Amino acid sequence: MSIKVAVVDNYDSFVYNLVQYLGELGAEPVVVRNDAVDVAGLRALEASALLVSPGPGRPEHAGVSSAAIAELGGEGLPVLGVCLGHQCIGQVFGARVVRAPEIVHGKASPIHHDGRGVFRDLPEVFEATRYHSLVVDADSIPDCLEVTAWTAGGLVMGLRHRTLPIEGVQFHPESILTGAAGHDLLGNFLELAAATASPRR
């Protein structure tokens, strides 16, 4: 499906793995650094979807990421946040981002999920790679968000906005250790974005 996806690069080495997957799935990714563009510049790209990448640090240090989620996502542009991007989604809508019980760097964990949205048709439980020291606090999720994925220990691994086409995943779908489920998750996001862009198609 040939849809343009604006990719906000939060200075992370995984960004081009995401871009490669998007290209393999037929999308047209356009990568912009988080400090090289503002929301108006992103809007001018006329993309059909926005992907906010992983990266170091906290959401408030992720340049245009949070403003883009709030403004463009708030206008109905489909958004997928990955790792730091997922944390940005949580914080934008009022959740707290806190230290994780343990720092994980390249750890594969079983992910449980609700089988909807970007998780449609994925295995009920799949292994995904995690690189993070922060998590969205499960006790602070606002009414507008729902938890869509979690670890066996109850850590939040996915979020979805209840009325806007915005989803986030804490794990890395583009990691080789995540495997086919990550590729399929990104494919689901592109399908959702295409359906949002062309509701009567």
What are these regions (language model features)?
Residues 28-36:
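A short beta-strand-loop structural module common to alpha/beta enzyme folds
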Residues 4, 28, 48, 78-80, ...:
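Structural signature of beta-strand start/N-cap positions in the alpha/beta core
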Residues 5-25:
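Short, charged N-terminal beta->alpha structural module
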Residues 108-110, 156-158, 168:
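Conserved hydrophobic/aromatic beta-strand scaffold that supports enzyme active sites
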Residues 171-201:
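Acyltransferase
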Residues 83, 132, 172:
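Histidine-centered divalent metal-coordination motifs
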Residues 3, 44-121, 186:
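Cysteine-nucleophile active-site neighborhood
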